Amino acid sequence: MSPLALVSVSDKTNIIPFCKDLVEKFGYNILSSGGTAEYLTEAKVPVLKVADFTESPEILDGRVKTLHPKIHGGILAKRSNEEHQREILENKLELIDLVVVNLYPFKKKVEEQCPWEEAIENIDIGGPSMIRSAAKNHADVAVLVDPNQYQNYIEEIKKGPLSKDFKTKLAFEAFQHTASYDSAISNWISKEKDLRPSNFIESYPLIKQLRYGENPHQKALWYGLNNIGWNSAEQLQGKELSYNNILDLESALLTVLEFGYETKPNIKTESIAAVILKHNNPCGASISNSASSSFKNALKCDSVSAFGGIVAFNANVDKETALILKDIFLECVVAPSFDKEALEIFKTKKNLRVLKLTKEMLPKENQTCSKSIMGGILIQDSDNQENSEDSWISVTKKNPTEQEYLDLKFAWKICKHVKSNAIVVAKDQQTLGIGAGQMNRVGASKIALEAAKEIDSGGVLASDGFFPFADTVRLADKYGISSIIQPGGSIRDEESIKMCDSRGISMIFTHKRHFLH
């Protein structure tokens, strides 16, 4: 008896040549339904329609086509089970040897912001049922859920009967496929109706296997959503991205996004930002009226740490900027756009990774962030709310000057992306010193202030958390700091305020903390 293949696909990529090969080279009969049957018939592929096979018409606007004992009995029957084979004969069923199914494009529809009713109609029922039936009975039935599997299947049946390992692998991929599909539906309803799931379910397709993780002895894989974020970034040149590159690129981009992000070169003057990042911490940042001047100012903060670092811009990178960058050893440069002349200059640094990530490639909604822990995972909202100044209060007798206020805003945005305890010293819209990841705030302050004094005197100071004591203010005064910005909220806030007043320092409370671990 000829093998029977059940074919029902939404993604019709390569389905015609695949089915022709099955029929002409391997003697398969094709069983199909709905649009797939019509599509194959038009291509002159002989097809038996499901409605004729089951002797039951499609009903309920096509909602019920393949949900029938003649379909699922033919898939689920175990060939080695005598009772199953007796029932197959008794009920005049035919065994189905291959199931080729992919599902309604639910993800694509909801990404297009379609109405609720249209999204519901794109929830596939019959497709997942056939896939799961075939995957369960994978000892006897092969199941294909992706056009990329077709050629491999042809190569395998050329060799003879399919191996147990091959069919098990197909079943594994099938269950992955249906699990991903169900998670997409669940997560969409959760977001649409603001429902908090009792189980965390998320599905990310494999992007690629990385050479290694943070260290060479650690294996690493990259999973992600298609056509968004780093998965959609265009790598214009350079070596393959590493695990550490991706982490640092993410941190650098999140920092530079604080100042806007424009694909076109005509971003407003005085708001072109450059951020240099190393080991997930900014080591220099600046905003000015050009990418080149912003980078040069950012580099002044810590040129030693910038060696082998990551640079992110929020605007076009031109020839002048590229000429400066090429003389420094950097791992990656990311920006929304690059001049042709800049890219030609970068070609002289063949190992430099240059990435173009346009504004359109960025996520359009607030995301969550997560951290693995033993036996679980922690999930929280991303700390990416706009820095509203409505809650800011000047708590000292002296108010910041106009320039100090601009510098405080700048330093506060950078401080948010520095590992806690974090202190940033800034002046004239550029960082002078950054104290990152210290176990006490005074220690972070000493690092930032000592670094700053090597570049310029004075400036403003930002802290990601409140001052538990007045010692940070006392230290800041010794280094000529004229204004401070911090969340406030300590039971000893008054001590810090009095210390500021006695030293002629202005201070703002933001009433928002930005710890980062």
From Swiss-Prot:
Domain named MGS-like: residues: 1-145
Signal found in the keyword field: no
Keyword match Hydrolase: yes
Keyword line: Hydrolase, Multifunctional enzyme, Purine biosynthesis, Transferase
One Pfam family matching this protein: AICARFT_IMPCHas
GO aspect biological process, one term: 'de novo' IMP biosynthetic process
Gene Ontology cellular component terms for the protein in this record: cytosol
Pathway this chain belongs to: Purine metabolism; IMP biosynthesis via de novo pathway; 5-formamido-1-(5-phospho-D-ribosyl)imidazole-4-carboxamide from 5-amino-1-(5-phospho-D-ribosyl)imidazole-4-carboxamide (10-formyl THF route): step 1/1; Purine metabolism; IMP biosynthesis via de novo pathway; IMP from 5-formamido-1-(5-phospho-D-ribosyl)imidazole-4-carboxamide: step 1/1
Reactions catalysed according to its record: (6R)-10-formyltetrahydrofolate + 5-amino-1-(5-phospho-beta-D-ribosyl)imidazole-4-carboxamide = 5-formamido-1-(5-phospho-D-ribosyl)imidazole-4-carboxamide + (6S)-5,6,7,8-tetrahydrofolate; IMP + H2O = 5-formamido-1-(5-phospho-D-ribosyl)imidazole-4-carboxamide
CDD domains assigned: IMPCH (cd01421)
InterPro entries, A to Z: AICAR_Tfase_dup_dom_sf, Cytidine_deaminase-like, MGS-like_dom, MGS-like_dom_sf, PurH-like
Transmembrane domains' residue ranges: none
Free-text comment on this protein's domains from its UniProt entry: The IMP cyclohydrolase activity resides in the N-terminal region.
Stated family: Belongs to the PurH family.
Protein name: Bifunctional purine biosynthesis protein PurH
Organism annotation: Prochlorococcus marinus (strain MIT 9515)
